[in-house]
């Protein structure tokens, strides 16, 4: 029951699945935006603000190309004691990431933005706090061998909806925030804007 054209500015299959299961009709269009080219921005933004900036940048990038559509941009930032982490690019980096997170609590800041005609309509970030249990080197190696390269798509090198749940001893936060798309607040906003009809 959609009243408008929606575009998801993300190539994430997990985000697309969430929207599809929620009954939304949308197109997928990846943003042409290099997240690693943000060194200067990181120095002046908190991790939560950075997630909003990146979600907005992605939504604006796609909105500029498809001005009449309502564009959803998303991003997630992992914050460990104020240090910002990006997605890993190899199994070796994945191993190091899990060693770093082992026995510590980190935060995931997931932002969602809505843009139309290149203009921001809404952006907001939500946080989840993830306590990783102490992990042995043997466990990390076995885990990475089992899950394969799919975890390289996750900034935390885990997929909470699968085997990644075994990495944690405590989680404080919304499931959708952990996945990287704060779905419930997004649906509320889409209803408020009249995009989803009751």
Curated annotation (Swiss-Prot):
The active site is at residue 75. SUPFAM superfamilies: ITPase-like (SSF52972). It is an enzyme of class 3 (hydrolase). Disulfide bonds: none annotated. Keywords: Cytoplasm, Hydrolase, Nucleotide metabolism. It comes from the Bacteria. InterPro entries: ITPase-like_fam, Maf-like. It is found in: Cytoplasm. CDD domains: Maf (cd00555). GO terms for molecular function: nucleoside triphosphate diphosphatase activity. One of its GO terms (cellular component) is cytoplasm. One of its GO terms (biological process) is nucleotide metabolic process. Its cofactor is a divalent metal cation. Transmembrane segments: none annotated. The record marks 14, 76, 161 as: Important for substrate specificity. Its EC number is 3.6.1.-. The keyword Membrane does not apply. It catalyses: N(7)-methyl-GTP + H2O = N(7)-methyl-GMP + diphosphate + H(+). Nucleoside triphosphate pyrophosphatase that hydrolyzes 7-methyl-GTP (m(7)GTP). May have a dual role in cell division arrest and in preventing the incorporation of modified nucleotides into cellular nucleic acids. PANTHER family: BIFUNCTIONAL DTTP/UTP PYROPHOSPHATASE/METHYLTRANSFERASE PROTEIN-RELATED (PTHR43213), BIFUNCTIONAL DTTP_UTP PYROPHOSPHATASE_METHYLTRANSFERASE PROTEIN-RELATED (PTHR43213:SF5). Belongs to the Maf family. YceF subfamily. This is 7-methyl-GTP pyrophosphatase. It comes from Bartonella quintana (strain Toulouse).
